[in-house]
Amino acid sequence: MDLQSMPQKPAEAFPLIAALDLGSNSFHLCLAKANIHGEVRILERLGEKVQLAAGLDEERNLSEEATQRGLDCLRRFAQFISGMPQGSVRVVATNALREARNRSDFIRRAEEVLGHPVEVISGREEARLIYLGVANSMPDSGGRRLVSDIGGGSTEFIIGQGFESELRESLQMGCVSYTQRYFRDGKITPARYAQAYTAARLELMGIENSLRRLGWQQAVGASGTIRAVALAIKAGGHGNGEISPDGLAWLKRKVLKLGDVEKLDLEGIKPDRRTIFPAGLAILEAIFDALELEQMVHSEGALREGVLYDLVGRHQHEDVRERTISSLMQRYHVDPEQASRVEAKALKVLAEVGDAWELNGELHRDLLSWGARVHEIGLDIAHYHYHKHGAYLIEHSDLAGFSRQDQQMLSLLVRGHRRNIPADKLAEFAEEGDKLVRLCIVLRFAILFHHIRGTQEMPSVRLKAEPKSLSVTFPEGWLEANPLTQADFAQEAEWLKRVGYSLNVR
């Protein structure tokens, strides 16, 4: 199929868009919807282990058996994209098909099954798309990221900042190819592991210096192998989901002691990943040692998410979380004028009480800003208990760019913007718990202040915050002339007593 002949229609104009990633180890499908704000909302994810790379012979021809495994998987995927128009589906193939001398035969047959063109992308293009997927799935760290993705036949390295990758490399080492080379019979010995590790270190020598010269502030892993390692280390009690040298060393000892892939019955390692796990672990250890990494975090977003965002064509330098919040407001028909009023007042109050209440962190400001903008999304469901509806929507939605913890905190902020503040739930965040209670109080104040939704100009007030109290002084005689506001704040004082805070209004 001729890619140039595909209609150049904006992705958001399609009811659905899809990305297929034909990897060396697994095939993946993501079905999504894009909107005019550039947000991609994942509707369905499918993945199957195909191990295409295991079907490459010494002459780099793909076996008929491996080809059939791939085509059988694509036939199942085809049911999801049947009838989708040209331009709404992008199919990319990576290392195994880059290497296969007879790839044209597989591609022809795959296109007949799918009805859409298959692109074999270069290692560096793969790296670019991986980075795009990561950047759109994690909060902007403010500095450079090093992203590593251990695939079945290759491993990609990208350094970038914001939504732009600056350096992209692809090395010929992967968990399937190294399994074929060093762990073919499933036996795990120190000697074999050392061979795999050394081979990876030799591959890395060619790019170590260029990566170090550019530098990075955060290391991110974006593959199933890295996710499995992180889960296994966490299950073993060595961290909270991040990967560290100590955690890797513990896991390596554990794997070598077990000695056989059939015995790798460890939490986090799925049965269908056991055969390739030792090879992936050796590659990851080599990456840590070669680049002297102290920590790596895992990103759920990677190649297929990058393909979707590339299909949409949105590459602005922006915090993806801002785009997500804007999309929530649109989706649930939030009144933008009221949201803007509440946000402006909340941020003004934060500036006044931030020092006294230790709310000077960037995340505090972000959470308050986001909470002010989306606190009314539950109204789109029903007015009764709308704060609970809104909290549920935030907690259980896929919010691009948000960490799970940030999403939970935002959900509780929305839950606590009226009636009872969920202090017991907020307390689960340890020392941040009381600060989150204070953020709730700030947001609630801003909402009460604009309860009349802009129908009346509100006065300037003086605020004084103490550890367990907030004093508010209105202009003389104003409250008496505005009994609704007076009643609102009297009721609010009763709610705040329940969480140990006093509200003094005069």
Curated annotation (Swiss-Prot):
Pfam families: Ppx-GppA (PF02541), Ppx-GppA_III (PF21447). This is Exopolyphosphatase. It comes from Pseudomonas aeruginosa (strain ATCC 15692 / DSM 22644 / CIP 104116 / JCM 14847 / LMG 12228 / 1C / PRS 101 / PAO1). The lineage of its organism: Bacteria, Pseudomonadati, Pseudomonadota, Gammaproteobacteria, Pseudomonadales. It catalyses: [phosphate](n) + H2O = [phosphate](n-1) + phosphate + H(+); [phosphate](n) + ATP = [phosphate](n+1) + ADP. Its main location: membrane. The catalytic activity is found in the N-terminal region formed by subdomains I and II. The peptide that connects subdomains II and III is also essential for activity. The C-terminal domain may be important for the recognition and/or interaction with long polyP chains. One of its GO terms (molecular function) is polyphosphate kinase activity. Changing residue 126 to A: Almost loss of hydrolase and transferase activities. Keywords: Cell membrane, Hydrolase, Magnesium, Membrane, Transferase. InterPro entries: ATPase_NBD, Exopolyphosphatase, GppA/Ppx_hydrolase, Ppx_GppA_C, Ppx_GppA_N, PyroPPase_GppA_Ppx. Changing residue 156 to A: Almost loss of hydrolase and transferase activities. SUPFAM superfamilies: Actin-like ATPase domain, HD-domain/PDEase-like. GO terms for biological process: bacterial-type flagellum-dependent swarming motility; bacterial-type flagellum-dependent swimming motility; cellular response to nitrogen starvation; cellular response to phosphate starvation; glycolipid biosynthetic process; polyphosphate catabolic process; quorum sensing; single-species biofilm formation. Its EC number is 3.6.1.11, 2.7.4.1. Degradation of inorganic polyphosphates (polyP). Releases orthophosphate processively from the ends of the polyP chain. Also has polyphosphate:ADP phosphotransferase activity, catalyzing the production of ATP from ADP and polyP. Belongs to the GppA/Ppx family. It is found in: Cell membrane. Its cofactor is Mg(2+). Exopolyphosphatase activity is stimulated by NH(4)(+) and K(+). Phosphotransferase activity is insensitive to the addition of K(+) or NH(4)(+) ions. Changing residue 151 to A: Almost loss of hydrolase and transferase activities. Homodimer. It is a peripheral membrane protein. Changing residue 154 to A: Almost loss of hydrolase and transferase activities. The keyword Membrane applies. The keyword Hydrolase applies.
